[in-house]
UniProtKB/Swiss-Prot annotation:
It comes from Anaeromyxobacter sp. (strain Fw109-5). The modification N6-(pyridoxal phosphate)lysine is found at K240. One of its GO terms (molecular function) is 8-amino-7-oxononanoate synthase activity. Its cofactor is pyridoxal 5'-phosphate. Its EC number is 2.3.1.47. This is 8-amino-7-oxononanoate synthase. The gene is bioF. The keyword Nucleotidyltransferase does not apply. Substrate binds at R23, H135, T354. Belongs to the class-II pyridoxal-phosphate-dependent aminotransferase family. BioF subfamily. Pathway: Cofactor biosynthesis; biotin biosynthesis. Homodimer.
Length: 397
């Protein structure tokens, strides 16, 4: 029976519906892949973060099944109690080796890592500097830290320099996404690292959308730019390019030792399931052994970039297989998503509050499992859905 104290929720849901902002789940009837079954139809999947096409890889499935048989379905407890299993340590050692750091620590998700690490590093007498377009989990972690939150304009190195110089604090922490998830552009990490060196600030880089994709060994943007040794906190996810689940923080041994004691999202949660960690361990080996996967997805991204620019979209700053097809208002983005589905493509509309009002978009992503023909077919379908009058801004028909 519905309880009266929750009646306010009905009004909230009605308001969300009226604004076109109410969200709903839509389950897949197939594993992740370049083509998925949704709503009884098989559609080309252009909204997954499975960048290397590993989520349904038989090697990951086998590793997960073997780990479940060997170590059980669940971990049963926090790692500080009775949930620290052999596969967790094996994965952490492999991550540290891949990242070139002394140690690494697993978290249940990227949100857990970003929400838990900043509060372990800074507090009331400190300041944390965050790009205005950082992921929501970073913002939440900064707020939970109770440090002074100083937000700087997106990728604005000069403003960050001024703020670092003009903000007194016991400790200073600069936090940035490596690749920004809604726009696909890269942070100016070389310049940010230089500012952190100059001001004695710690540097935290969220490589969620760069891990496995960028860099000679798939280490991320910091590796690609040659500044990995100047990053104090490397955060990456295991559920995007690596196709499994969970996240990690890599860095100096003393950093990890502190997080084991102070990161509440590590201490007060059940350890990751053995199957997920084993799948991630298998994926990491594939990332190192098969660089052609990175080359493949980046080549497809280059093809998509050319096609979108031909249609009038500015994607010149995109540095990863993430493309913002910005259409403006929410209704226009939703209409485009529906029209593309009718043409066989699964692309979700991204609306406020995920992106700023007036920038609703289609967020188009690619994986190494896609083909050139699928990219070209999508561009053709998008051209049908959009009209470009007189070379002006694209709009939905």
């Amino acid at each position: 029976m519905a309880r009266a104290p929750l009646d306010w929720i009905d009004r909230e849901l009605e308001a969300l519906e009226a604004k076109g902002l109410r969200r709903a789940l839509e389950p897949l009837a197939s594993p992740q892949g370049p083509v998925v079954e949704v709503g009884g139809r098989r559609l080309v999947n252009l909204c997954s973060n499975d960048y290397l096409g590993l989520a349904a890889d038989p090697r990951l499935r086998s590793a997960a099944a073997e780990a479940a048989e060997r170590e059980g379905a669940g971990s049963g407890a926090s790692r500080l109690v009775a949930g620290d299993l052999p596969v967790h340590g094996a994965l952490e050692r492999a991550i540290a080796g891949h990242a070139g750091t002394e140690a690494a620590l697993l978290f249940g998700s990227g949100y857990h890592a970003n929400a838990g690490v900043p509060p372990a590093l800074v507090g009331r007498d400190d300041a944390v500097f965050s790009d205005v377009l950082n992921h929501a989990s970073i913002v939440d972690g900064c707020l939970l830290s109770r440090a002074k939150l100083v937000r700087y304009r997106h990728a604005d190195v000069q403003e960050l320099a001024d703020l670092l110089a003009g903000t007194p604090a016991r400790r200073k922490l600069v936090v940035t996404d490596a690749i920004f998830s809604m726009d696909g552009d890269a942070a100016p990490l070389r310049e940010i690292a230089g500012l952190c060196d100059r001001h004695g600030a710690m540097l935290y880089v969220d490589e969620a959308h760069a891990t496995g994709v960028l860099g000679p060994r798939g280490g991320g943007l910091a590796e690609a730019l040659g500044v990995a040794d100047r990053v104090d906190v490397h955060m990456g996810t295991l559920g995007k390019a690596l196709g499994a689940a969970g996240a990690f923080v890599a860095g100096e041994r003393r950093l990890v030792d502190l997080l084991v004691s102070r990161a509440r999202t590590f201490v007060f949660t059940t350890a990751p399931a053995p199957a997920a960690s084993a799948a991630a361990l298998a994926a990491l080996a594939i990332v190192e052994a098969e660089p052609e996967r990175r080359a493949r997805v980046l080549a497809l991204a280059a093809r998509m970039r050319v096609g979108l620019e031909r249609l009038g979209f500015d994607v010149s700053r995109v540095a990863a297989p993430i493309f913002p097809v910005i259409l403006g208002d929410e209704a226009r983005a939703v209409a485009a998503s529906r029209a593309l589905r009718e043409r066989g493509f699964f692309v979700r509309a991204i609306r406020p509050p995920t992106v700023p009002r007036g920038t609703s978009r289609l967020r188009v992503t690619l994986t190494a499992a896609h083909g050139e023909a699928q990219v070209d077919a999508f561009l053709g379908a998008l051209e049908e859905v959009l009209r470009v009058p007189g070379g002006g801004a694209p709009r939905v028909l």
